[in-house]
């Protein structure tokens, strides 16, 4: 069939006799001949089956039934078939198949839509799903060689996505929705700016690549030249070994492909059918090398034979590749940026030949491919480009520099660079095993809460951090709606920078999951566009303001904007709060001083724009609550954002002091408007309009609009824009009426959502201190996408289609279940799901630059370790904190005490470590483990301590904070100040033996 380029055939396993669409395969049931004349013929396949019109209806996946499907069997079609030229064929010639004896609609049609596995029914002429064409068997191309998956494989590292089918032949969801092998199965690698998508093909291995700055379009406002994030192109490695073919016996065995998140390495492995030779292909996107590198090897010497070619990402990127000296390159120019891509092949053994058709390697032991690409985009140039003349030299130098190193050197520096970020955090749920392919892991996820389900959740958290590192380093631009990965010239929503939640959500995990450096490309983009370019200042002017800056919902990388909702000018406030958030986690005062002018000018925009309402509060004029309901003054979304902006700006002024350089008039105006600002925290009473299955009538909910009721919106809408106060901010306090009203609003909205919306809801329910409800949303998010929200088999989040923000939202939400600190208190296990019975999460970051490790068993903490990186003071809250033994490693002014609410205030010098040990497993620094058999005994009478045993040389008494209370050579001594304390007594004998005893003073 012309649409979808699929072949007609019958089931090869005999499950039914219907004619369906299949991926091309050289099997007898797809090879057809026409017997008769062009106006009266029969269709018979090589298996001897005739096509006929059945009168037995069949159900259609997309709904309904096909009343007269085509089937195959021994019956010839009465009256035969004829062909007529298809009208309005846009991509090549084609025909319509007509059932001559059928009345009414008699043209064969893909029934129910264009997707693999659809049956063929009958419809009227001139439908796009009618058109078919014929190809000779010798001219047919196939997706890939056949392959048999490996058995009993377990990846080296648990945090690995793995599969036993290539992306080239894996089945797609039958409902269509624009799904592709790329979206469903390709595996992403990225160095933060330059990335690739891996398919694991055998006959023709594809690395489809992207570069974050390759955009069409210009810096214009609301024009047809807005542009798209473009597919850069693909490099192919075609198998020339002669060891495989497309027949059922000529395929590969022992196949698997994987993405190891621990090392950020892709891999494909397969063997010949008899298992005698194994081929391995490994892939990295190296930040140090600024290139993608692949290595192709075989288990026997001289068995690697490949042809390398490269194609630009047509139709958006149209360029011709030229080949010379083992390299291929193409270049060109879009409306603003110029681009250049180059690869180089390095062979170890065998021969290398370059022709006009590509680079061929024959009989090599090893082949290394180096791929680099770049544009002349420069975010700090007024024209957004620079050094166009040097672009080719830049890309060539990256290729040459990498080619001059061995694979092992490139791999080692890549892994070391990646792991210094990725290894900071470790999340483990007890009992998890990664023993089944990831697509099967997803399919089995809905079956329960066992080890497989927990493994998928653990993997999904790690994947979010992996994608953050892979998409947000290098150039000062944020990751877009798809991170940096895209295989289309016109992707959904242009794969742009969406400012009404999506780009912000991309960075929700950055600070709390200890990836502050990955936040910087977004933050520097905000500062640069606000301070150094004119577009955002122009949008502020267009909104009627003489000071400040703003942007709209849809943004390209040149400051250009789309047409959607130009009255959404509150994005500047949301952006500016990210600048402050980075300071809260890092305490980088020089950074704050740099970006503060952008915070101040955003505040000035709103200081000038706010209007005084009749109730005496300041309101934002004519805003709307994304993406529904009326536009009006004082919508809760905008009010909460301005409140956070003003609060952050005032806090920054306090930190910077005179360095803030704020005029007295501005400071007074800011403070006055902050004090009188409508906070967007009004409530209304739900009247049961949308039913009472979620909440009952008479329940208090937060108002989304100040002057319109909740009925102005849509029931179950995907945005929760009036709940900024709950997440990402902390404007409502647990235990208060406003907090409960916010929770009620969440209940009313329901659990249904798009992919990114579920990412938000996971965070909201974690902030609501309801871990089980948060996990319900996580369960929904990890359901395989069959046309709607969920995940694809490569764990890409599905809106649908693919949007990466949901990956990041879920990652942040899982961290929120274990630790929260946005309210300036470290809350331990605030929303632990009951299914996460035992596990640990280490390396999380809290505000004020504290690092937090938590281990728990049976739903309760067993050890909490908190590191005070910069000598700050912060409360820590955990319900059972009073039950812990407390150890302090470092100098503190006062002993750590816990109040009746489970709160301890932590203070100390930089580097101080606090350990809250609940099960006695912690071993203080410098203290030997306490063993049940001791060479010495300790007796206590009152405040007197007596040591019995031979040859006692020294006795040291240590409190539970790791401090030495007493050191003596005496075997009897008093502890005057130790009443009621638990202590460690360390006894050293003359022969060097050490015994330790835990004692409790009366």
What spans do the regions from the language model cover?
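Well-ordered alpha-helical segments within folded domains of soluble proteins
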Residues: 500-511, 568-580, 637-648, 721-730, ...
């Amino acid at each position: 069939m012309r649409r979808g380029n699929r072949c007609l055939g019958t089931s090869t396993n005999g499950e039914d006799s219907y004619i369906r669409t299949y991926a091309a395969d050289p099997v007898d049931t797809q090879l057809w001949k026409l017997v008769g004349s062009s106006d009266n013929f029969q269709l018979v396949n090589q298996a001897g089956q005739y096509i006929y019109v059945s009168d037995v209806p069949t159900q259609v996946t997309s709904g309904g039934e096909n009343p007269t499907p085509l089937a195959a069997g021994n019956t010839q079609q009465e009256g035969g078939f004829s062909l007529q030229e298809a009208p309005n064929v846009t991509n090549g010639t084609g025909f319509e198949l007509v059932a001559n004896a059928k009345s009414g609609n008699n043209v064969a049609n893909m029934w129910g839509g264009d997707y693999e596995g659809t049956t063929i029914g009958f419809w009227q002429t001139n439908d796009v799903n009618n058109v078919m064409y014929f190809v000779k068997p010798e001219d047919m191309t196939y997706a890939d060689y056949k392959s048999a998956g490996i058995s009993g494989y377990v990846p080296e590292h648990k945090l690995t996505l793995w599969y036993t089918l290539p992306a080239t032949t894996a089945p797609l969801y039958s409902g269509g929705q624009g799904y592709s092998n790329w979206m469903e199965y390709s595996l992403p690698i990225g160095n933060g700016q330059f990335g690739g998508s891996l398919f694991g093909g055998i006959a023709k291995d594809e690395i489809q690549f992207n570069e974050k700055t390759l955009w069409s379009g210009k810096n214009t406002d609301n024009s047809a030249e807005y542009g798209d994030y473009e597919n850069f192109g693909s490099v192919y490695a075609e198998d020339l070994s002669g060891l495989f073919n497309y027949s059922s016996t000529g395929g590969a065995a022992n196949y698997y492909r994987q993405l190891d998140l621990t090392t950020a390495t892709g891999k494909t492995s397969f063997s010949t059918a008899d298992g005698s030779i194994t081929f391995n292909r490994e892939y990295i996107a190296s930040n140090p090398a600024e290139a993608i590198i692949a290595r192709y090897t075989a288990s026997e010497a001289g068995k690697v034979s490949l042809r390398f070619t490269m194609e630009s990402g047509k139709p958006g990127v149209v360029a011709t590749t030229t080949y010379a000296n083992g390299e291929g390159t193409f270049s060109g120019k879009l409306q603003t940026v110029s681009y250049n891509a180059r690869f180089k092949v390095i062979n170890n053994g065998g021969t290398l030949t370059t022709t006009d058709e590509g680079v061929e390697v024959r009989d090599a032991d090893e082949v290394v491919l180096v791929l680099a690409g770049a544009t002349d985009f420069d975010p700090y140039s007024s024209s957004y480009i620079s050094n166009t003349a040097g672009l080719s030299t830049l890309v060539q130098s990256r290729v040459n520099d990498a080619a001059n190193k061995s694979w092992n050197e490139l791999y080692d520096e890549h892994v070391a660079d990646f792991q210094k970020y990725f290894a900071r955090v470790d999340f483990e749920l007890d009992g998890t095993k990664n023993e089944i392919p990831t697509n099967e892991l997803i399919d089995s996820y809905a079956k329960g809460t066992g080890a497989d389900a927990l493994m998928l959740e653990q993997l999904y958290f790690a994947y979010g951090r992996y994608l953050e590192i892979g998409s947000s380093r290098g150039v000062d631009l944020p990751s877009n709606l798809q991170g940096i990965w895209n295989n289309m010239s016109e992707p959904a929503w242009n794969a742009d920078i969406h400012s009404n939640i999506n780009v912000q959500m991309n960075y929700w995990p950055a600070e709390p999951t200890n990836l502050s450096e990955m936040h910087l490309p977004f933050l520097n983009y905000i500062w640069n566009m606000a301070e150094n370019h004119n577009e955002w200042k122009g949008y502020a002017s267009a909104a009627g303001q003489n000071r400040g800056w703003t942007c709209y919902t849809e943004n390209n990388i040149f400051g250009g904007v789309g047409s959607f909702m130009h009255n959404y000018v509150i994005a500047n406030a949301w952006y500016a709060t990210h600048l402050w958030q980075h300071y809260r986690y890092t305490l980088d005062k020089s950074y704050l001083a740099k970006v503060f002018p952008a915070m101040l000018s955003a505040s000035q925009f709103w200081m000038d724009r706010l209007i005084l309402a009749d109730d005496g509060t300041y309101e934002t004029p004519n805003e709307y609550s994304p993406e529904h309901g009326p536009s009006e003054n004082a919508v809760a979304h905008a009010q909460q954002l301005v409140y956070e902006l003003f609060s952050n700006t005032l806090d920054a002024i306090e930190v910077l002091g005179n360095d803030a350089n704020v005029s007295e008039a501005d400071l007074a105006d800011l403070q006055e408007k902050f004090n009188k600002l409508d906070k967007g925290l009004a409530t209304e009473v739900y009247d049961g309009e949308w039913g009472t299955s979620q909440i009952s009538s008479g329940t208090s909910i937060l108002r989304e609009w100040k002057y319109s009721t909740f009925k102005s919106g849509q029931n179950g809408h995907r945005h929760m824009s009036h709940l900024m106060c709950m997440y990402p901010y902390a404007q409502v306090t647990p235990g208060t009426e406003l907090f409960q009203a916010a929770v009620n609003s969440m209940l009313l909205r329901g659990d249904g959502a798009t992919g990114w919306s579920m990412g938000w809801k996971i965070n909201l329910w974690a902030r609501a201190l309801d871990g089980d409800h948060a996990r319900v949303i996580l369960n929904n998010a990890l359901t395989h996408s069959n046309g709607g929200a969920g995940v694809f088999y490569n764990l890409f989040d599905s809106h649908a289609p693919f949007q990466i923000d949901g990956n990041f939202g879920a990652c942040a939400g899982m961290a929120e279940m274990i630790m929260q600190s946005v309210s300036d208190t470290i809350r331990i296990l605030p929303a632990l799901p009951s299914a996460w019975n035992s596990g640990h999460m280490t390396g999380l970051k809290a505000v004020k630059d504290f690092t937090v490790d938590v281990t728990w068993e049976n739903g309760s903490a067993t050890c909490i370790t908190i590191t005070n990186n910069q000598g700050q003071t912060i409360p820590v809250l955990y319900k059972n904190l009073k039950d812990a033994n407390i150890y302090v490693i470092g100098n503190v002014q006062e002993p750590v005490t816990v109040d009746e609410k489970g709160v301890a205030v932590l203070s100390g010098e930089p580097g101080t470590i606090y350990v809250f040990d609940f099960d006695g497993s912690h071993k203080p620094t410098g203290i030997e483990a306490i063993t049940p058999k001791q060479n010495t005994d300790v007796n206590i009478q009152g405040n007197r301590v007596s040591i019995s045993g031979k040859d006692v040389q020294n006795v040291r008494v240590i409190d539970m904070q790791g401090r030495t209370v007493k050191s003596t050579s005496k075997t009897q001594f008093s502890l005057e100040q130790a009443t009621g304390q638990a202590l460690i007594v360390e006894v050293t004998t003359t022969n060097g033996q050490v015994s330790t005893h835990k004692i409790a003073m009366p």
